[in-house]
A protein has these predicted regions:
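Juxtamembrane membrane-water interface segments immediately following transmembrane helices
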Residues: 1-12, 216-286
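Multi-pass, polyprenyl lipid-linked donor-dependent membrane glycosyltransferases
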Residues: 61-67, 92-127, 167-184
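Membrane-helix interface segments
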Residues: 54-55, 83-91, 153-158
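Membrane-interfacial entry segments at the cytosolic side of transmembrane helices
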Residues: 154-157, 197-225
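Membrane-interface transmembrane helices that cradle and orient dolichyl/undecaprenyl
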Residues: 123-157, 188-196
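Short hydrophobic/aromatic helix or loop-helix immediately within or flanking a transmembrane segment
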Residues: 2-53
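Membrane-interface alpha helices of multi-pass inner-membrane proteins
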Residues: 157-172, 224-228
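Transmembrane-helix motifs of polytopic, lipid-linked glycan transferases
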Residues: 60-84, 122
Length: 286
C-alpha cells in the first residue's frame, strides 16, 4: 500500500525500481492494480488538500471501503430471501458477519483485496440469481404475508452485475477471468432455461413461461463484452498513452518458480515410475 501511495505521487518505490519503465519520469506502474492505486492515492490527495494530512486521506479511504464492504455483505444476505432462504438461516448468517472479528478487521485493511472481494461478492450473487432464474423457489415470508414473491433479477440487478464484473476486472491484475467465467456460466444457464421453457410449452401446447426472459443471456454476454472492451482499452490504449508501465511477467511465473524451488529443496527426485529425475545441481533430466 505504501508503494501505491508513493507511485501516485510519483515518488520512488520498491516496484518501480525493478521494472523497465516506459518513461523514467512516470513511476506509476501496473505491479498493483492501477485503478486501486488511483482510488487510494486520490483519497490521500484529498486528505492533504482538505485537512493537510495524509492520515486524514487514509481515514477517508478506510471509511468508504468499510461502508462499501458492509453494504455488499448486507446485500448478499438480503438476496438470500429472494432465493428462498428462510429467516432463521439468514439471521444466523447476518449475526456471523456482525460478530465475527475477522470481517470488521478485514474491512479496514488498506489493500486491494478488500474492494476486489466486495466486487466479486456482488458478481457472485448476481451470477447465482441468473442461474436460479428458471428454478422453482420458495419464499415462506411472502407466502405467510400474502404478498407476491419478489422478482429474483430486477432491472437494477443489471447495473450491479456490470459493477461487480468491472470491479473484479480492474481491482485485481488478471481479474478478467472472474467475470469471464461468471458471465459464460450465467449465459449458459439463461439459454438453457429458455430452451427448457419452450420445450415444456411445445409438449403441453401452452405459452412459454413469462418468468423466463428470452434474451436475458444476450444481456449477460453484453456485460461480458463491456468488460472485455474496457480491459482492452485500459491496457492497450490508456496505459501506454499515459506511460504507465505494465506489471512484470515474473508475477505470472512466481507460483511455478516457487513450487519448482520447493521441490528441488525438499525432494531428492520424482515419484517412482516417472521418467524425469532431478540432479543435485537442480537440473531436470529425462
Amino acid at each position: 500500500t505504501g508503494a501505491q501511495i508513493r507511485q501516485w505521487f510519483n515518488y520512488p518505490n520498491g516496484t518501480s525500481d525493478y521494472l523497465r519503465l516506459l518513461n523514467p519520469d512516470v513511476l506509476l506502474n501496473g505491479h498493483h492494480p492501477v485503478v486501486h492505486t488511483a482510488i487510494i492515492g486520490s483519497c490521500v490527495r484529498l486528505g492533504l488538500s482538505v485537512f493537510n494530512s495524509a492520515n486524514a486521506g487514509l481515514i477517508i479511504y478506510t471509511t468508504v471501503q468499510f461502508t462499501v464492504t458492509a453494504a455488499c455483505m448486507a446485500y448478499s444476505v438480503s438476496s438470500l430471501r429472494k432465493l428462498g432462504v428462510g429467516l432463521p438461516v439468514r439471521g444466523v448468517i447476518l449475526l456471523f458477519f456482525a460478530f465475527m472479528p475477522m470481517f470488521s478487521n478485514y474491512a479496514a485493511l488498506l489493500t486491494k483485496d478488500v474492494l476486489f472481494a466486495d466486487a466479486f461478492l456482488v458478481l457472485l450473487v448476481q451470477t447465482v440469481k441468473l442461474m436460479a432464474g428458471g428454478l422453482p423457489r420458495r419464499d415462506a415470508n411472502a407466502a405467510r404475508a400474502g404478498e407476491q414473491a419478489p422478482v429474483l433479477f430486477a432491472r437494477h440487478d443489471w447495473l450491479l452485475l456490470a459493477l461487480g464484473a468491472l470491479g473484479s476486472t480492474f481491482l485485481r491484475n488478471g481479474g478478467l477471468v472472474f467475470p469471464l467465467a461468471a458471465c459464460m456460466i450465467a449465459a449458459a444457464f439463461c439459454a438453457w432455461d429458455v430452451y427448457m421453457s419452450y420445450r415444456r410449452a411445445a409438449r403441453t401446447d401452452a405459452e412459454p413461461l413469462q418468468s423466463v426472459p428470452r434474451f436475458r443471456w444476450l444481456g449477460v454476454l453484453a456485460v461480458l463484452a463491456l468488460c472485455l472492451a474496457s480491459n482492452a482499452y485500459f491496457t492497450k490504449v490508456f496505459m501506454p498513452a499515459h506511460d504507465i508501465t505494465p506489471g512484470s511477467k515474473r508475477e505470472m511465473l512466481s507460483i511455478p518458480f516457487q513450487q519448482t524451488a520447493r521441490f528441488v529443496q525438499k525432494h531428492d527426485g520424482l515419484n517412482s515410475g516417472v521418467g524425469p529425475t532431478v540432479k543435485e545441481d537442480g537440473t531436470i533430466m529425462f
